[in-house]
Each structure stands twice: as C-alpha cells, then as structure tokens.
From Swiss-Prot:
Residues annotated as binding S-adenosyl-L-methionine: G108, L127, G128, D129, F130, I131, L132
Protein name: tRNA (guanine-N(1)-)-methyltransferase
Keyword set, alphabetical order: Cytoplasm, Methyltransferase, S-adenosyl-L-methionine, Transferase, tRNA processing
Species the sequence originates in: Streptococcus mutans serotype c (strain ATCC 700610 / UA159)
Protein family: Belongs to the RNA methyltransferase TrmD family.
Amino acid sequence: MKIDILTLFPEMFAPLEHSIVGKAQTKGLLEINYHNFRENAEKARHVDDEPYGGGQGMLLRAQPIFDTFDKIAAKKPRVILLDPAGQQFNQSYAEDLAQEGELIFICGHYEGYDERIKTLVTDEISLGDFILTGGELAAMTIIDATVRLIPEVIGKEASHQDDSFSSGLLEYPQYTRPYEYRGMKVPDVLLSGHHENIRLWRLEQSLRKTWERRPDLLEHYQFTQEEKQLLEKIKSEGSS
C-alpha cells in the first residue's frame, strides 16, 4: 500500500516509523510519503486566510492543497479528508480502506477548509464527536487501524480477526503467567486444555462484555443459535 499525507507538520508522524506500521514499511508492504503543502503556497507561503462573509478563525486556502495534490495524484486514489463533520470511523471502515492500493490523507489545521478543497475528496472521516487541533492525530489513528489489516503485516491473520469489533463483538478477557498474581487467579477453564469449553467461555465473555458495555453493537449483530442462547443466559443472570 502507498500512502501520501498532505500536512503542515510532517514531523508529527514520527510514531509511524515504529511498531507495526514501521515494520510494514521495513518489509516493503507499505510506503508513506509526507508532503508539506506550505511549500507549494503562493502569497509568501501563506496557507490560510480569513473567511468570506466574516467569522472566527482562519481557513486553509485551496491553492496550496490543489497544487500539492496535482503533483502526487497521477491516478484516482481514495482521498481522505479529516473532518469532524465526516462519517465516523470504525473497524468496518478500516477493513474497507485496507483493500486499497493507494490512499491520500489531507490533514487540516486552523478553523477549517475552503469548501472547494472537498472536490478532491472521496471520503470525509471523523473519529468522533470531538474537536482536535488538526487532522494529523486522526490520520495516524486511521492509518494504524488500517495498515495492521493488510495481509502479512501482522504474522497471523487470526491475531486481528479476534480483536474487538472484527467479529462484531468486544474481545474476551485474556491472561498470561503467572496463574495467580496479588490474589487474582486465571479462570480455571483456560488451564483445562478442553478446547470446546475454552471456546464457549470466550464466546460467553465476549457477549457479556458487549452487552454490558456496548449494547448498541448487538442491535444489528447476526446471532447464531448458540449465541442467542448464551445471551439469554447472560441476561437472566443480570436480572436475577
């Protein structure tokens, strides 16, 4: 996958040189290029200006971003604009982006964008109902969530398929050595060696955590008969 990032602050992306995303670049599975669109700004390198009609703050001008975009977008890639008014990002969105061969991220700053910039964009994405200083942190979050889903980036595909949200449910609790720590013990079923009992325990724990913490995820979840029975058991225990 190739990713191009239009930003005023390329240095903010240093964390992408480490961990999973950094290893993906080392393996040749990922290429990330940073483009400071201030370098293409006319008018003494000014990238922002006052909004027509008045108002608070400054807007990013169209010219620097268009000129930068023209230099890098030979094809018609997926172009992502980070915007609090965009579609909310989730695991399903990450899985969709991971199928792409090329992505371009436009990271804003200041009060907002000249609306004409959005004619370049295929996706407007938000992380949630809150405001960040700029689009850089949001872009890094989306890139991390997306890149780890690219085949061969993570050693075992099952490693991310078991993650929270990948199955539609929150992930079950996990434990490692020692068996007991400060009076807290690992559930005995996990030491039993009985694979079916372990599978059922994990499924029940995932359902329980999802029902208690994110019941909204269950509204459109496609239950198996086994899952329906387990959820009814969980609900009856909760009401007893």
